[in-house]
Amino acid sequence: MFEQLRTIITKYVEVKEEHITLDSRFMEDLGFTSFDFMSMLGELEDEFDIEVNEQEAATIRTVGEAASYLEKLTSE
């Protein structure tokens, strides 16, 4: 899940995959805007055939939290 998420992240910000870690924060470390983040969530919904809860997604700060959330949604 982490590797797939890392690849998708690089579509939204100019960061090399190898610089993205589980502890990377979307806004502070990777330079995401709110629009970037919401756009990425839409792509994740399409890619993994899931439905992201916007209130839950608003609490996600790091790549690791996003990966855990995606794993939870894809296992339901």
Residue ranges of each PLM-predicted region?
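Two-component histidine kinase catalytic core, primarily the HATPase_c
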Residues: 36
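Phosphopantetheine-dependent thiolation modules in NRPS/PKS and related acyl-activating systems
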Residues: 1-32, 41-42, 47-76
